[in-house]
Each structure stands twice: as structure tokens, then as C-alpha cells.
Regions:
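Conserved glycosyltransferase catalytic-site signature
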Residues: 20, 64-67, 172
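A generic structural signal for residues located within well-ordered alpha-helices
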Residues: 15-18, 146, 166, 170
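Predominantly a Rossmann-like dinucleotide-binding segment in NAD(P)-dependent oxidoreductases
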Residues: 1-60, 185
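NAD(P)-dinucleotide binding in Rossmann-like oxidoreductases
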Residues: 46, 57-67, 72-147, 164
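Phosphate/oxyanion-binding loops and surfaces in catalytic or ligand/nucleic-acid-binding neighborhoods
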Residues: 25-30, 103-104, 178-181
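Solvent-exposed beta-strand sheet faces enriched in polar/charged residues
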Residues: 36-38, 82, 191
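A general structural signal for well-ordered alpha-helical segments in protein cores
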Residues: 19-20, 145-149, 175-176
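C-terminal helix-rich "cap/oligomerization" subdomain common to oxidoreductases
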Residues: 74, 120, 127-128, 136, ...
């Protein structure tokens, strides 16, 4: 998992895909135009980071434990995206969607599991005043199970999956763009195959 040959790209390709999917869904899944990326494996290469558990991992560590991307999307949307497995911080912070008619604060969460532990907050102008209100968090213990069941049902019955393949391609094109940009030090061409 931590070796380049078998682990791929690290945190961006692992937990980054879930956070990126959440943000792209919130803005309508536009196609990427350009991506500038940065990756680092600094903490993963430090023996002291592992305490006494597995210091030998530092020598094997070959994937990024931190990645950041600045993504320009269709429709004039810009995404400032960061993800990390390891950092000297408790969180990289809340996700902020800043629109022309309002904003949305999405609390830092382990969004891979399909739910939020805290409510999201909407900010907007009403009658000339800035207001904010929380969106209630739906109570459910089985969001992840629902995702898996939906996928299995689509495969068994030949139906449409809840996540279109076009979204998976956009998500992966952005991740690939961030990793390539970090490797070459400039913006690569982003190509999203048509489905």
C-alpha cells in the first residue's frame, strides 16, 4: 500500500477520490480544464513518524502522503483541493463552496462512509442581510451499505448504477492530472474520455 510499485499514488488516489467526488457532486460534476498539482511523501519517509511500530516503513514509503491541486473546471468554477494521510494537524479544514449567490461549508469528515457527523452550513444574502442556517444531517446507519447494494443491483439486473461512469472518469482525470502536474512541475493536458 505504501510502495510505489503496488500502492500507486497514495492519499490522493485513495481517500482523495471520495472527497473529490463529494465536491464535484455539489457543483454538478463539471469537466476539468486545467490542473496544477503538488505531492509530498515527507512524513512517510521519516522513521520517527512511525514511533516504534514499524520504522522500516520509512525506507519503503514511495507514495504521496499529502497532495494538493488547483483545478479549473467548466463554468468558471475553481477548486482548491488538498488531501492527506499524515500531517501535523488534526484536519485540513472544512470544505468551502463559495458561489455568487451563496456559500456552503462542509465540515471536515471521513466522507468515504457516505455520511456527515456534523451539519453543513449555508450562507447567503436575504433581504440585504447575510444569513446562515444549518442543513440537517439525515440519520442512517447504512449509507455505505446502500451504495454497495445499489452497485450490486445494477450489475445483477443490468440497470443503471447510481454513480455514472462519466463521473468516475472525471474524478480520475483530475487525480491523474494532479499527480502528473506534481511530477512534471507544470499543468498537463487534461483529457476525459467520452463514455
Amino acid at each position: 500500500f505504501i510502495e510505489k510499485e503496488t500502492g500507486g499514488v497514495g492519499a490522493m488516489g485513495d481517500i482523495g477520490s471520495y472527497s473529490l467526488d463529494l465536491l464535484l457532486n455539489a457543483v454538478g460534476y463539471p469537466k476539468p480544464l486545467t490542473v496544477t498539482g503538488y505531492t509530498s511523501n515527507f512524513l512517510g519517509k521519516q522513521k520517527e513518524f512511525y514511533s516504534k511500530s514499524h520504522p522500516e516503513y520509512a525506507e519503503k514509503f514511495g507514495v504521496a502522503d499529502f497532495a494538493a491541486g488547483f483545478v479549473r473546471l467548466e463554468g468558471g468554477i475553481v477548486l482548491d483541493f488538498r488531501i492527506s494521510w499524515a500531517m501535523h494537524m488534526d484536519t485540513l479544514g472544512d470544505a468551502l463552496i463559495l458561489g455568487t449567490k451563496g456559500g456552503l461549508k462542509i465540515p471536515s469528515t471521513e466522507c468515504w462512509n457516505g455520511y456527515f457527523s456534523q451539519p453543513m452550513t449555508v450562507y447567503k444574502m436575504v433581504a440585504g442581510k447575510q444569513i446562515s442556517y444549518e442543513l440537517p444531517v439525515p440519520k442512517s446507519d447504512n449509507f455505505f451499505e446502500k451504495k454497495i447494494t445499489s452497485f450490486v443491483d445494477a450489475v445483477k439486473d443490468g440497470g443503471k448504477p447510481t454513480v455514472p461512469s462519466s463521473q468516475a472518469l472525471i474524478n480520475q482525470a483530475i487525480i491523474d492530472g494532479i499527480v502528473k502536474s506534481a511530477a512534471v512541475g507544470k499543468e498537463p493536458t487534461i483529457e476525459v474520455p467520452e463514455v
